[in-house]
Regions:
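N-terminal secretory signal peptides
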Residues: 1-38
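Conserved alpha/beta-hydrolase
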Residues: 115-133
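Gly/Ala-rich beta-loop-alpha elbow adjacent to hydrolase catalytic centers
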Residues: 159-167
Length: 356
């Protein structure tokens, strides 16, 4: 009785007592545990990869949609001052070439600030770069088309920072087709990458490979960076907000355009093949304490590139870097003085003849 009670009863099999080979049972149970896990892991991995790819593509697509502008644009504001200047100075025009990262809309603001001084010599226009990147040939074609339509034979260039480099290359090309470039004004323009004080210039080559694939994320970072790097008298918070605002402005430049501008800057002046005659005046407009461009090095560089051309230097202290839209009165006076020196205005009255 005692021995019988101590013997345990055999366990009941889950399928009602069917006998199964012992060596197959563990294999069956392992199979049951693993089969559902493997597809689930693959499914989750596939979904994660798809989500990442979608987010990446959406990021780039959003950046493109935000900045869609496929052609270079020449814009001549239709206002009374420009019409009056066109009547006074037929066959002449100004072209403002914007700087690095300056949007089409901001280029218009810069022109508006400078137009009263520009109109003392010619009507004023500004250029909008294409978001596909800097292409001097296409930019030249856009300007050539505009000069043909308006019958322009004399051009004045205002180069806003980076725009001074582009103006230099374009001026030589325009001279080849018979259009004379009377004056080029360098508004805070570096003469080479060595003049640039921004330490990030060391990463231009890397940026050329990486930046075009950053989309909106890169746009946000670039906005903060540009705002803090060029506050123009604003506090850190206001400068960062302004930078982000410019970066996400629908008229803002694409990251691809900014990257090609940077690589163009790094290579300059190798793109310049000469062709600018010694009669073309070179205006040099700088804040001596510019924190983006070393003004002294830039001036020396331009004078070395154009040793036979007339130069005139005008300092605009405490204005920061390339900021006519922020300090319009200062820039108008400066531009007026430069033009009076390099391109004296035509006489409107007969000079007084001395008695003796």
């Amino acid at each position: 009785m005692t021995m019988a009670a101590s013997n345990p009863l055999p366990e009941q099999l889950p399928d009602g007592g069917a006998v199964h080979p012992a060596h197959k049972s563990p294999e069956r149970h392992r199979h049951i545990r693993q089969v559902p896990d493997t597809p689930r892991r693959w499914f989750l991995a596939t979904m994660a990869a798809a989500a990442a790819t979608t987010a990446f593509n959406a990021n780039i697509a959003a950046d493109y949609q935000l900045t869609e502008r496929s052609q270079f644009r020449v814009t001549t504001p239709d206002n009374d001052k420009n019409r009056t200047a066109a009547n006074r100075f037929p066959g002449k025009t100004w072209y403002l070439l914007p700087g690095f990262g300056v949007s089409y809309r901001d280029a218009g603001r810069k022109l508006k600030a400078l137009q009263p001084a520009m109109n003392q010599r010619a009507p004023a226009s500004y250029i909008g770069y294409a978001n596909g990147g800097i292409d001097i040939a296409q930019l030249f074609i856009a300007i050539q088309r505009d000069t043909f339509e308006r019958r322009i034979d004399t051009v004045y260039f205002y180069g806003d920072s980076f725009g001074g480099m582009a103006a230099t290359v374009l001026a030589g090309l325009l001279e080849e087709i018979g259009i004379h470039v009377r004056v080029i004004v360098m508004g805070s323009s570096p003469s080479s990458v060595r003049d640039v004080l921004d330490p990030s210039k060391e990463y231009i080559s890397l940026a050329g490979k990486v930046v075009p694939y950053l989309g909106l994320v890169g746009r946000l970072a670039a906005g903060v960076w540009s705002g803090l790097a060029n506050p123009n008298g604003q506090g850190m918070y206001e400068a960062a907000r302004a930078g982000i605002g410019r970066s996400f402005n629908q008229a803002s430049d694409s990251l691809i355009l900014k990257t090609t501008q940077a690589t163009f800057l790094q290579a300059f002046p190798t793109q310049y093949d000469g062709g600018i005659p010694s009669s073309t005046g070179i205006g040099l407009l700088y804040d001596p304490k510019d924190f983006i461009v070393n003004a002294r090095l830039a001036i020396v560089g331009w004078e070395a590139l154009f040793p036979k051309n007339p130069h005139f230097e005008y300092d605009i202290p405490d204005t920061g870097h390339a900021s006519p839209e922020i300090h319009p009165d200062v820039y108008r006076v400066a531009l007026t003085v430069i033009l009076d020196q390099l391109d004296p205005p035509p006489l409107t009255t007969r000079p007084v003849q001395p008695i003796f």
